[in-house]
């Protein structure tokens, strides 16, 4: 997405003989170092890529976190310093996604009952300082027109310090699809919610998706959908006044839908802007 940023691998921490508190401190330092270096932890999309989208009841599913672009991503190992929420919700309710610190997959879940599972990961905010060229380019590419216009009105032409959070979800189906089961809100700051169960759909049908910010519909946001088999052939739409977009999905396979929203950072945040990156994956 941003050609000026260097892609590097996330450091492997799982072999270090550290206590839990030492791991958290080191993890936070590593995350900050990666963010400040402009590595893909910030620069690209983040999504959930389960080891299977169609597990059997009782099966254990690995919940892999990926950071990259166009379905080419580096692993994001489990880091407790980053996790705000890491959950799965099914017909029996919500429970945490467990895992081992430093491991990839970052989480493991056992399918307790057949049906649709909604898996979600919400990160804590991380900070980054961006040059004017890099910040302006990414604001343009992510369709953040309101931010660009506000900076122009204020005569802000320099770089910017930003805090960013990831809000990723994935839909996994165990057993036969059921029209009465669907995606649901997990209460993430920025969230994509499929208003139709994609596992009940066929090729060429419309998938309505709603985008919310702080549990309210977000209008005018750029929403992008891509298929893993041909990620360069993207579908794009702007959310309407109800936060809704509709995508006619032209092929089977794994889909990723994403959106970014940016606001002015709260006082005391030691940053000018706060961004939220939402994603939703499923298989058609």
Segments predicted by a language model, with ranges:
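Bacterial N-terminal signal peptides
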Residues: 27-38
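Sec/Tat signal peptide C-region and signal peptidase I cleavage site
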Residues: 39-43
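Short acidic/polar inter-strand loop motif in beta-rich domains
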Residues: 124-132, 263-268
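Bacterial N-terminal signal peptides that target proteins for export
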Residues: 11-29
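Short amphipathic beta-strand segments in non-cytosolic proteins
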Residues: 84-94, 222-237
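Beta-strand-rich domain onsets/edges
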Residues: 44-61, 146-207, 212-217, 229-231, ...
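Glycine-centered loop-to-beta-strand initiation motif
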Residues: 103-107, 239-253
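N-terminal, post-signal-peptide region of Sec/Tat-exported proteins
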Residues: 66-102
């Amino acid at each position: 997405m941003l050609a000026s940023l260097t892609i590097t691998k996330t450091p492997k921490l799982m072999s270090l003989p550290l206590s839990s508190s030492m791991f958290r401190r080191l993890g936070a330092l590593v995350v900050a170092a990666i963010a400040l270096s402009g590595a893909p932890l910030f620069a690209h999309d983040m999504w959930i890529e389960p080891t299977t989208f169609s597990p059997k009841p009782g099966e254990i599913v690995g919940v892999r976190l990926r950071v990259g672009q166009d379905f080419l991503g580096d692993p994001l190992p489990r880091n407790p310093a980053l996790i705000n929420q890491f959950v799965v919700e099914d017909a029996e309710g919500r429970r945490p996604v467990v895992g081992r610190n430093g491991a990839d997959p970052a989480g493991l879940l056992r399918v307790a009952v057949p049906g649709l599972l909604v898996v979600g990961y919400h990160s804590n905010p991380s900070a980054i300082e961006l040059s004017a060229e890099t910040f302006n380019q990414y604001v343009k590419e992510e369709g953040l027109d309101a931010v660009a216009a506000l900076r122009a009105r204020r005569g802000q032409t320099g770089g910017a310090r930003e805090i960013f959070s990831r809000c990723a979800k994935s839909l996994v189906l165990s057993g036969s699809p059921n029209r009465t089961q669907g995606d649901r809100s997990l209460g993430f700051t920025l969230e994509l919610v499929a208003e139709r169960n994609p596992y009940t759909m066929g090729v060429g049908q419309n998938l309505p998706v709603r985008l919310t910010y702080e549990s309210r519909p977000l209008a005018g946001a750029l929403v992008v959908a891509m298929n893993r088999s041909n990620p360069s052939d993207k579908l794009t739409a702007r959310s309407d006044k109800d936060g809704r977009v509709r995508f006619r999905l032209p092929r089977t396979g794994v889909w990723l839908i994403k959106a970014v929203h940016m606001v002015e950072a709260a006082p005391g945040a030691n940053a000018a802007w706060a961004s939220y990156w939402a994603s939703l994956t499923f298989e058609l």
